[in-house]
């Protein structure tokens, strides 16, 4: 394929053939790099139908020719300087797109990249380069026993070091934070927005006090009150690691507001991520309760600073979330270049329980940052 000559890949987005396929147009630039644009959906041509696929070039897109992480399948352990010395954090690149590079910030604090793995079913077909990343203390990254490192500003500095190591800049760098990750993304944008091309704030209010009020005034009154009383009693007695506490939360809170699927149907990456949460980070920062925040983040509020974030920003909320969707809509209105995406069937993990809305809205936002043509 010569420079500028396009070819088209049509990828099925639903194995049953009920959703239109997406058309991704690829061309080779003069410098040899691949560039793609993702058009709107084209008519469905039947189940499992892939047309005009150039397998060799598709493989190049995934392998990232000339990238230093090809041998490791996209994995890089990034050295991070901290006040207590150097540690390493785990990252994994998927895809190769010079214009759209998305770094994913997981929640918790202390959760893992794993619950983002559902993105693999959607972002590659849209030609988006994205990075999994376990923050320090999480999953595959170093896990120092150092409570003094679990500070917001220290995490912001870590993200900046990761950005530099991965070679991301304002021509391509999108940052997506979900839950605690959105807190971190807001803080990063307030300090380093000159490096951002765009920002995605997923399922997180800009004020922990407002979140606590929503939990107390809206979520808790709708719960079974006997179950709520037992949950509170277990929290007050410090028994949040008791299996009974988790069972009560699952039945009366999680399947309503965290992931609206029966527990036995929760996707394996979500179950795995929940099992790997580092409570040595989570409890000091978030607090032991799942019905509000009482840790180091309890007073965090950046609502009054949102107007300072000038990069294009997508705010994602959900009808059944633990986070007030009206508050998230207001966040988008406060951001100079904000837009709001509402997931009417979704909860805190709307990327799973309202996947079609979430992924199509995210991809549309990222596609807006591409060149229209070579």
Predicted regions and their residues:
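Conserved HGGG/HGGXW glycine-rich cap/lid loop of the alpha/beta-hydrolase fold
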Residues: 84-143
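Active-site loop/oxyanion-hole signature of alpha/beta-hydrolase fold enzymes
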Residues: 135-180
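Conserved hydrolase catalytic core segment
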Residues: 171-214
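A catalytic-pocket lid/entrance helix-loop region that shapes and gates access to the active site
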Residues: 198, 202-240
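Alpha/beta-hydrolase
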Residues: 222, 226-307, 311, 330
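Conserved loop-alpha-helix segment in the C-terminal half of the alpha/beta-hydrolase fold
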Residues: 303-345
């Amino acid at each position: 394929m010569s420079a500028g000559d396009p070819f088209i890949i049509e990828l099925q987005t639903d194995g049953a053939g009920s959703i239109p396929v997406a058309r991704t147009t690829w061309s080779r630039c003069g410098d040899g790099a691949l560039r793609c644009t993702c058009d709107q959906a084209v008519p469905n041509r039947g189940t499992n139908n892939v047309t005009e696929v150039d397998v060799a070039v598709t493989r190049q897109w995934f392998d990232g020719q000339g990238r230093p992480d090809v041998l490791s399948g996209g994995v890089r352990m990034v050295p991070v300087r901290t006040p207590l010395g150097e540690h390493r954090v785990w990252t994994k690149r998927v895809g190769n797109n010079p214009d759209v590079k998305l770094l994913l910030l997981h929640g918790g604090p202390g959760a893992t990249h794993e619950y983002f793995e559902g993105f693999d079913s959607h972002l590659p077909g849209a030609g988006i380069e994205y990075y999994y990343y376990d923050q320090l203390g999480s999953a595959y990254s170093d896990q120092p026993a150092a409570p003094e490192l679990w500070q917001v500003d220290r995490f912001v500095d870590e993200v900046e070091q990761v950005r530099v190591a991965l070679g991301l800049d304002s021509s391509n760098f999108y940052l997506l934070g979900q839950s605690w990750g959105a807190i971190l993304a807001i803080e990063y944008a307030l300090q380093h927005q000159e490096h951002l091309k765009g920002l995605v704030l997923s399922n997180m209010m800009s004020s922990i006090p407002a979140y606590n009020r929503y939990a107390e005034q809206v979520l808790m009154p709708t719960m079974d009150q006997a179950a709520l009383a037992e949950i509170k009693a277990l929290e007050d007695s410090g028994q949040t690691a008791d299996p009974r506490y988790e069972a009560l939360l699952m039945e009366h809170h999680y399947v309503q507001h965290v992931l609206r699927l029966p527990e036995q149907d929760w996707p394996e990456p979500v179950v795995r991520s929940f099992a790997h949460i580092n409570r040595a980070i989570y409890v000091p920062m978030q607090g032991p309760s799942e019905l509000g925040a009482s840790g180091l983040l309890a007073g965090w509020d950046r609502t009054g600073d949102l107007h300072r974030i000038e990069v294009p920003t997508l705010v994602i909320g959900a009808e059944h979330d633990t986070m007030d969707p009206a508050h998230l809509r207001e966040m988008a209105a406060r951001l100079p270049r904000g837009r709001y995406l509402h997931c009417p069937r979704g909860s805190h993990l709307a990327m799973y329980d309202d996947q079609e809305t979430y992924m199509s809205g995210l991809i549309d936002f990222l596609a807006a940052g591409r060149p229209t043509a070579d």
